[in-house]
């Protein structure tokens, strides 16, 4: 594999698709040599203008207006799928059947049954990478907290208090889109709560059960847009209104196999919090707190600091922490990083998997996405049963 180049494509030219396109563009510039030449071949989107602009902006050779063109292309080996969730299964299965390595955005599918089918399709192509993108695993700060758990810096997890607060849906005049369709559980829970669930297990181990779930919708209908919309952008509205089919807020309690607990809340109507993921992890020997709005630091308290200097302190993230050494043009303390860089780290890790390198932690397989979907399903069941405990 390393004797030949890799052709890369991205399906979806929206907000997340652009992040994947940019990630591949920079992937060969981090962590030294090792990858074969990477060709940025195509960006595909039904909206030709979006596809063309994204391809031009990030240096891809061409744009396409159908995912089928990507699947049929002989010069493409690796594909990111960054489109509406209901399309993930059809596109990913077709790409695997066409011999492409696939990195699919989360949530893996719109239902557990669809996710199971995707895992089965991946099993039929064992020589191909079929992965799901839980990008926050690539955060140097979050990965550092995981290391602190594993090395007993903060001890064994006792309780995780996590949140993901966004306001992309806070405006009732925001246009209707696929994000507001699909039934209960496909809204804030699937869109951003899936990240929280994955991070909970990333830091605390497997979830054994969920309870106390609440799923709430506070904006019950929206107007259809008068034109095309990218990501969470505003647009002119038509006179046609449709009901919102899924939840704006998701809240749950998770119980881990280790005995640890978590309270997790996700909201897409948190006015003033554009993109705020955070947590406080309480361990047997200390505590670590993170907020995506200040991604280059952690708040830490641990039992190794006693007496008059004990207490909460700020730890700046730098070369001593995961991903940064070799992963940034200026990889020394105080430079900082952001969420866009996580897509670069993820793209590099995925390309390494494709060619069989073992440098970075692997991008999780479809099976991890299915597992996450099953936990989401348990949350929906708990909410439907007035917060009853649902075992996994």
Language model features: what each stretch is:
Residues 219-247, 251, 255-258, 285-363, ...:
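C-terminal glycine/acidic-rich active-site capping loop/insertion
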Residues 41, 61, 75-77:
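Conserved acidic residues
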Residues 27-35, 125, 152, 356-358:
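Alpha-helix termini
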Residues 78, 84-137, 152:
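Beta-strand-loop-alpha-helix segment that lines the small-molecule cofactor/substrate pocket
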Residues 1-58:
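N-terminal Rossmann-like dinucleotide-binding module
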Residues 194, 265-274, 338:
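Glycine-rich phosphate/pyrophosphate-binding beta-alpha loops
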